[in-house]
Amino acid sequence: MSTPQLSMKGQWAQRLIRTKLADTINQSRQVFPLPGAGHPHDGFLLPGQPPEVTWDNLPQDEWHSDQEQGAAMFSAAEVEEQMPPRKVCIIGAGVAGLYIAMILDDLKIPNLTYEILEANERVGGRIYTHHFSNKVHDYYDVGAMRFPKIPIMDRTFDLFCRTKVPLRDYYLNGGDQCPKLFNDRLFAQGIDPYHVSKANGGHVPDDEVDKDIAGDAFKPYKEALKDDFNKGWKELMKVDGFSTREYLRVGGRDGKEKKYDYFTIQWAETQNTSTNLFDQAFSESVMDSFDFDYPATKKEIDPKTNKEVEVEIPVEWKCIEGGSTLLTDAMQKMISQPVQTKKRVEAVNIDPTTALGCLGRMDLRSLDLDPSVKDAIRSLHYDDSVKVALKFHYPWWIVDCGINHGGTASTDLPLRTCVYPSYNINDGAKNEAVLLASYTWAQDATRMGSLIGTKESEKELVDVILRNLARIHAKDTTHEAYEAMYKKVHKAYTGTYHVHSWSHDPYTSGAFALFGGGQFSKLYPLLSFPAANGNFHIVGEASSVHHAWVVGALDSAVAALYKFLRKEMLWGALIKLRENWKVPEEVEIGINGTAHLQVGYDAIQRKLRKLEA
């Protein structure tokens, strides 16, 4: 697995962790020595240290000196053989929990075993494929379904290689054939195709109707971060408490930027994301946008002009042929210990990889958690997500609408997004086909989810979606065109469907972490630090800088293992972990890294709490 260049999100995570550590050390250094982090292990603040530390001047990790590593490796095998028996308990058999098990099997640490407890009868967590039958392509991915081949996703694709799952192309963009319907109008070329501007009877100012106002607001911060991360980070932190909506409304921190009215902001949100997602942190929106600053470009010589030009490198998107569950199925087969399913955990003094909503229902009193960690578990915002798949007698979107290259349809109707599968485009015009008819997030998902649960309500849900599909795919917006399309879609529908709401799922209690204003800068470091004297690690996408992605769950698993091994001083295993699995950028190892301080953070906080009491 290659080591990617440090991402912008990685730099952000490192800075937040360093700032939190510096603040805590400065708070405590006048009161007591700090245990459990440096070398020797009776404290790392030695005489002669400066009176105050800063994010870029933290106590060093002396183990990373050549002399100390050499001495540690010389005796590592003998010491590890003499270690007392220990067990790692992994709560949750999603991709993070299974990944931890795979790594522990590879490390082969003497006298260390593990067990995996899963409350659900199904293994995989938020990687979940629903099969309507055993027929080829008679499925859809309820959870993770598409993976961009970009540098920050290297660990995910490395896992694909290790598990040998079959990949195929995923078509994110299906071209002009994929319909868009907003304000009861199908897309047409022009400045205001949906007639929401004041000139066309709407409420959005004419000069703003076709602008990317969110992208324009993000741009100066992104450019500042690229030019000089330290200066850019300071500027971004000044607006960390703003939601995207509030930032656009008031014109930034000082009110000197462009201010937008309610209708302009609403229209921008409708076009760019799901209902109410502009309520997430502005800083989070800025950093998230870096993930999709692709395609990249490369320089080539234009044969016509013989001049150097920049050529776009399109991003490859992949999906797993047969469904994403093949990944977690393969991982489960590779690990040495069986997953214990239907094991409901009521109290915790071990390592959870479960979602925070589920963790919050467990009795955590024995852990003596920092109050702010308890607050993070309770209050960190999770987004909702609902998917509805319908099965049809034939792929009418291909046969009747010419949508034969995947992609998505977008609308302000309740279904919001329709996803045309990439895996069944060549299955023939007469075979049954599954369509991801509705994919919603945030408030759109909450409202769609309100129709889940009873036969009558789900009958209404399916009817709404069938009618929405007809309106979106009709050749025009006349009633006659709609009726004709509705008859076609309704006749093609087999009567078979599947619906899933992640916020209604008792094993997840939400789809993925989506930090609100100020939450990432304040809560992320706390979620990433070990607790309970280094024995408790919160693992999963919520405790990663790349939350809401599979790679975030994988990164958090490696980060937790590294800090566990560092705390136990298992030097040989640490080096093997670095060589075989790489360490995510937010851990920051090396003599000037922060991993040793993250391990010691909980001990500092415990002493501070006792003094304050």
Name each region found by the language model.
Residues 3-72, 362, 400-613:
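Conserved flavin/dinucleotide-binding core of flavoenzymes
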Residues 3-24, 161-162, 169-284:
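Mobile amphipathic helical/loop "lid" adjacent to a hydrophobic cofactor/ligand pocket
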Residues 4-19, 23-39, 125-155, 174, ...:
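Glycine-rich active-site loop/strand segments that organize a redox cofactor
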Residues 77-223:
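N-terminal glycine-rich phosphate/pyrophosphate-binding loop and immediately adjacent elements
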Residues 124, 160, 248, 331, ...:
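Generic structural signal for small/hydrophobic residues in well-ordered secondary structure
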Residues 223-348, 352, 359-360, 385:
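Active-site/ligand-binding neighborhood in enzyme catalytic cores
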Residues 351-372, 386-389:
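Flavin (primarily FAD) binding-site architecture
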Residues 371-399:
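Central beta-strand plus flanking loop segment that forms part of the substrate or channel wall
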